UniProtKB/Swiss-Prot annotation:
NCBIfam families: maleylpyruvate isomerase family mycothiol-dependent enzyme, TIGR03086 family metal-binding protein. The lineage of its organism: Bacteria, Bacillati, Actinomycetota, Actinomycetes, Mycobacteriales. Residues 151-172 are annotated as: Disordered. GO terms for molecular function: metal ion binding. Pfam families: MDMPI_N. It comes from the Bacteria. Gene3D superfamilies: dinb family like domain. Residues 157-169 have a biased composition (Basic and acidic residues). This is Uncharacterized protein MT0763.
Length: 182
């Protein structure tokens, strides 16, 4: 799948779920035990804002609009524009984990956003059967990249959790990245 299309589909999945989150749910727990729903949303919006800050020629994001959905959409649009710009896929991004080309970074962002869309769905009682084609692709990418060095306390991912093969691909992705699928 085209990386820009995949990125947009992950952002769209998150936005669709976010539109159904009620204010009284924001303090609730998520599959990421250290985060509330509001923290999870902030992580995704903030991650999108960081794309410009980590670019070879750093770009500060515009002021956040009011409202969670508007803030996400604005930050996602700017991140997408940076990747889609001429040279965006070959540009070097300076992440905390090191320098990576745009082609790699967009895949990391896509997986992060889709996985946190799953977290948001699970936390708010929405369907976790998210974009099966995209989830299959991101699961394959995660299997290639996420080894034992990235799992455990103080690391980005918990150990892989069991997930029946008949479950939707997004559930399988979530379980591979350490979420308990119910």
């Amino acid at each position: 799948m085209d990386p820009l299309m995949a990125h947009q589909r992950a952002q769209d999945a998150f936005a669709a779920l976010l539109a159904n989150v009620r204010a009284d749910q924001l303090g609730g727990p998520t599959p990421c035990s250290e985060w509330t729903i509001n923290d999870l949303i902030e992580h995704v919006v903030g991650g999108n804002e960081q794309v410009g800050r980590w670019a070879a020629s750093p770009i500060e994001p515009p002021a956040r609009p009011d409202g969670l959905v508007a803030a996400h959409q604005a930050a996602a649009a700017v991140a997408h524009e940076i990747f889609a710009a001429p040279g965006g896929m070959s540009a070097t991004f300076k992440l905390p984990l090191g320098e990576v080309p745009g082609q790699v970074f967009i895949g990391l962002r896509t997986t992060d956003v889709l996985t946190h869309a799953w977290d948001l769905a699970a936390a708010t009682g929405q369907s976790t059967d998210l974009d099966p084609e995209l989830a299959v692709e991101r699961l394959a990418a995660a299997r290639a990249l996420v080894g034992p060095q990235f799992r455990g306390p103080g690391k980005p991912f918990a150990d892989e959790k069991p997930c029946p093969r008949e479950r939707p691909p997004a559930d399988q992705l979530a379980a591979f990245l350490g979420r308990t699928v119910r």
